[in-house]
């Protein structure tokens, strides 16, 4: 995540994170929604916090760069 956020070659707004969202099932946020990446949570501008263990997939554009096995 830090690579996409801080490296000048990447546009962080193209990052998409899919995560388990109770009770909805799955939800997705973009890099533009992310305020801070903490040790255990990703904090959103909306005030929500996504625990790292609920993340199931990270994409950059259309490419899946990480998927939970």
UniProtKB/Swiss-Prot annotation:
Protein name as catalogued: UPF0248 protein AF_0420
Organism: Archaeoglobus fulgidus (strain ATCC 49558 / DSM 4304 / JCM 9628 / NBRC 100126 / VC-16)
InterPro entries associated with the record: MJ1316 (IPR040459), UPF0248 (IPR007547)
Pfam families: MJ1316
Family of this protein: Belongs to the UPF0248 family.
Organism taxonomic ancestry: Archaea, Methanobacteriati, Methanobacteriota, Archaeoglobi, Archaeoglobales
